[in-house]
């Protein structure tokens, strides 16, 4: 995600007239990368931008370099943390390191699409990074005591406190409003309303046979290959794999079943104009979809995005898809 700032966000949003040096941090450093990092310390007088992943602050190498960089610009530096829920845990090593190093920057900002993931208590470390006085609490525990109802429980001979519910959330919301800015999707994007359409795809006879056998007996057989499941959850997974047309036998053999899903997808795409994002659950499905699209619409028509694609290549694929004048129309992930 952090490479997105280097490849897309800064090039799009930083004005062309601003002279700058922009360097992407990488944990494994070659001589070329070291020389690139050294340009952040020259005296050209331009804007210096260091882009690091949050995980780097869990390492001494990343923390030391960030410390060195910020010490050069005391009183002038800004630190921004994207996806700031990555520092929501006040006891995590990287959170503690970032809170400490944040004191070297005169300006601090956070960005997130979901400041509260599980609990309002997630807000404490994020807000403390901005300014310890924003919430009016000097410690996480006083903050928790103010906004959470706690209960003591004994586990294995030791006593722990558990959150049972939350309180004074209106008060907390009022405090947040004073130093936060919320932008809704409809405020910044001109998008049509979502339209949901369900398309029913019939299973082939081969799929139906495997599906109902697995459903009844938690076992399915294909050309002598057995697929079984030991739990209800595994059975549900196997049933889903069968409906998708591909499953793994117990000996890890990949079994392909005739299915109508790909034909239904291609029919749907013939009715669609503009760019299309296609999500699939399994890598094998992605592979089949990409092959079919490239065969029908050309090699440059489709890019894929998943963990099996190199991180640098993934960013290139995003850029290709976002290029309104480019040939890439389908994004499969």
Regions found by a protein language model. Give the residues of each.
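Inter-lobe coupling linker of SF2 helicases/translocases
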Residues: 38, 51-57, 67-73, 92-106, ...
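Conserved helicase motor
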Residues: 22-34, 54-59, 88-91, 280-284, ...
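Conserved helicase ATPase core of P-loop NTP-dependent helicases/translocases
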Residues: 33, 277-279, 287-288, 297-333
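Conserved Walker A/P-loop ATP-binding site and its immediately adjacent core
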Residues: 1-10, 117-122, 281-283
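Walker B catalytic acidic pair
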Residues: 82-83
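Conserved two-lobed SF2 helicase motor
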Residues: 44-61, 323-333
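Conserved helix-turn-beta segment of the N-terminal RecA-like "Helicase ATP-binding" lobe
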Residues: 2-30, 130-134, 296-299
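Conserved helicase ATPase motor motifs in RecA-like P-loop NTPase domains
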Residues: 106-120
């Amino acid at each position: 995600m952090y490479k997105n700032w280097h490849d897309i966000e800064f090039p799009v949003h930083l004005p062309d007239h601003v002279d700058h040096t922009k360097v992407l941090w990488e944990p494994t450093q070659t001589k070329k990368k070291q020389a690139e990092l050294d340009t952040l310390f020259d005296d050209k007088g331009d804007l210096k931008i260091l882009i690091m992943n949050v995980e780097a602050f869990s390492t001494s190498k990343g923390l030391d370099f960030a410390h060195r960089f910020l010490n050069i610009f005391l009183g002038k530096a800004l630190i921004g943390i994207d996806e700031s829920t990555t520092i929501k845990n006040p006891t995590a090593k990287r959170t503690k390191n970032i809170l400490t190093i944040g004191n070297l920057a005169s300006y601090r900002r956070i960005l997130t699409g979901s400041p509260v993931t599980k609990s309002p208590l997630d807000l404490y470390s994020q807000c403390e990074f901005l300014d310890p006085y924003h919430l009016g609490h000097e410690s996480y525990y006083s903050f928790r005591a103010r906004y959470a109802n706690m209960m003591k429980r004994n586990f294995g001979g030791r006593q722990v406190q558990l959150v049972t519910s939350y309180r004074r959330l209106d008060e907390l919301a009022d405090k947040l409003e004073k130093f936060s800015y919320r932008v809704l999707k409809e405020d910044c994007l001109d998008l049509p309303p979502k339209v949901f359409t369900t398309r029913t795809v019939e299973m082939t006879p081969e799929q139906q046979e495997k599906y109902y056998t697995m459903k009844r007996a938690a076992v399915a057989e294909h050309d002598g290959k057995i697929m079984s499941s030991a739990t209800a959850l595994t059975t549900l997974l196997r049933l889903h794999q069968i409906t998708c047309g591909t499953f793994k036998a117990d000996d890890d053999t990949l079994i392909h079943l005739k299915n109508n899903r790909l034909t239904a997808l291609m029919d749907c795409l013939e009715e669609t104009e503009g760019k299309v994002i296609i999500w699939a659950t399994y890598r094998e499905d992605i592979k089949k979809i990409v092959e079919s699209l490239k065969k029908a619409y050309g090699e440059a028509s489709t890019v894929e995005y998943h963990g099996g694609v190199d991180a640098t290549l993934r960013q290139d694929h995003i850029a290709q898809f976002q290029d309104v004048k480019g040939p890439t129309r389908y994004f499969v992930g």
